[in-house]
């Protein structure tokens, strides 16, 4: 019986940071196969792709196993949702037309089995924290900037995007080991009191006490934290280190990993 709702994020498919990108994709496809008979809906909460840009007639190569499995589940009646992350912000209508997916460019508040969820990738909430990121956020979502980018041949843009992503992640890992961690990447170095998504959830919950659960991706952290009055905030981890996801069965919301199923 299809009764469970799943949430996952940050697979970064195609990333050169993965020791073996194909292994990551196969693992993700295997997870989808395992949950196919129980899944009522699946929410992919951003950065499932390390880079994604849709031209009018062209999309990035690869991801065949993942997209094929998602298409199978959609055809079987599973509700599919994709959120734009900061790496795959340039989604348009491909996933909707080919997979029947609901695409969300911003966070949403939705009722699921009687509880109210605030769902977002997590990058949008950083705009109020750092002005430079707010400028970058606006630039990446600017229609003119997108039009100009689309005018450049993919031969140049795809390699450049993957290269910038890899450099950014390596730089973040280096800062982490020095104790300077604007991007935490790892629970081992995580300061929960200063995490902006935790602060956002606390502040938002004070203004919107009707929200029961907050679920984010983006930070590559595994977090399940209690707020006031039995409210909770979850950060989903990733498919780089944790192979993790959350599942809601209408009564219980838990963080799990692919290894828990083996």
UniProtKB/Swiss-Prot annotation:
Keywords: Cell inner membrane, Cell membrane, Cytoplasm, Hydrolase, Manganese, Membrane, Metal-binding. It is an enzyme of class 3 (hydrolase). GO terms for biological process: lipid A biosynthetic process. It is a peripheral membrane protein. Mn(2+) 1 binds at residues 10, 12, 47, 220. Pfam families: Metallophos. It catalyses: UDP-2-N,3-O-bis[(3R)-3-hydroxytetradecanoyl]-alpha-D-glucosamine + H2O = 2-N,3-O-bis[(3R)-3-hydroxytetradecanoyl]-alpha-D-glucosaminyl 1-phosphate + UMP + 2 H(+). Its EC number is 3.6.1.54. Induction: Induced by oxidative stress due to hydrogen peroxide. GO terms for cellular component: cytoplasm; plasma membrane. Belongs to the LpxH family. This is UDP-2,3-diacylglucosamine hydrolase. It comes from Porphyromonas gingivalis (strain ATCC BAA-308 / W83).
